A protein has these predicted regions:
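Surface-exposed amphipathic alpha-helices with a cationic face
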Residues: 75-79, 133, 155
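Glycine-rich phosphate-binding loop signature in dinucleotide/nucleotide-binding domains
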Residues: 21, 132-139
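Structural recognition of alpha->loop->beta junctions
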Residues: 104-116, 177-186, 190
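Non-Sec secretion/translocation targeting segments of pathogen effectors
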Residues: 199, 206-209
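Acidic, Mg2+-coordinating phosphoryl-transfer loop and its flanking beta/alpha structural elements
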Residues: 138-186
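Donor nucleotide-activated moiety binding/catalytic core segment of transferases
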Residues: 119-135
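Short, surface-exposed basic-aromatic patches at helix termini and helix-loop junctions that form
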Residues: 99-107, 134, 154-164
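Alpha-helical substrate-recognition element adjacent to the catalytic core
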Residues: 2-119
């Protein structure tokens, strides 16, 4: 084998490797997984989720106060590596939601969202995943969510499931962020340091240039 043949073989291998990586799907929930939107959470007097109250707070005035969670480090790393990264969310996505994603460099290859469906979270995500994965060449890989019932749905499609709260907590500890009020039954939502998020974002943006 001469040098030119070796170079061509290396290019072919790299192309094949890139294509294999791109076929692998990594899915992220948004709320309480990548984004802390707890200040907009609404409940009825009985403690059940108030969807109408949530919708009323889905304006830019409120959404701009949302905060990125530590799992964004992983999001940017997966994007940089070339995986297909999607959002699977129970939100009814509107312009303020998309604006927040754009302004925080959360660029998904696809966003599977509620639309006008009134289904429960896990039922909605089951249908959206079924439709998305029915297209040839898509391989389920990782699925991040804060709810066990959604993780169970993802397992049916072959995803390795990741509990968002635990990964956010691990990232906090790994990056030496302050950890407070943790016990076996109460894992709080933690926010990463701005400078750490900035470093991850810069690495991702540099690759795009």
């Amino acid at each position: 084998m001469n040098l030119n043949q070796a170079v061509q073989m290396r290019k072919a291998f790299k192309k094949e490797h890139t294509e294999v990586i791109k076929r692998q799907v990594i899915a992220f929930d948004l709320d309480h997984t990548l984004i802390d939107s707890s200040h907009r959470h609404c409940t009825h007097p009985d403690g059940s989720f108030n969807l109408q109250g949530w919708i009323e707070k889905s304006t830019w005035e409120h959404i701009q106060k949302d905060v990125l969670l530590p799992l964004c480090h992983h999001f940017w790393a997966f994007k940089e590596a070339g995986f297909t990264v999607i959002a699977v969310t129970a939100r009814e996505m509107r312009e303020p939601d998309y604006r927040f994603l754009r302004e925080n460099d959360l660029e998904f290859d696809a966003i599977l969202e509620r639309g006008n469906s009134k289904e429960l979270d896990e039922q909605l995500k089951n249908g959206k995943l079924r439709e998305f994965l029915s297209q040839e060449g898509r391989i389920p890989y990782l699925f991040f969510d804060d709810k066990d019932e959604n993780l169970e749905v993802a397992k049916k499609y072959g995803f390795q499931t990741m509990k968002a709260q635990l990964f956010n907590l691990k990232t906090v500890v790994k990056d030496y962020h302050s950890v407070r009020n943790i016990n076996e039954n109460n894992i709080e939502t933690f926010s990463p340091k701005e400078e750490d998020l900035a470093k991850s974002k810069i690495n991702y943006l540099n690759r795009k240039i």
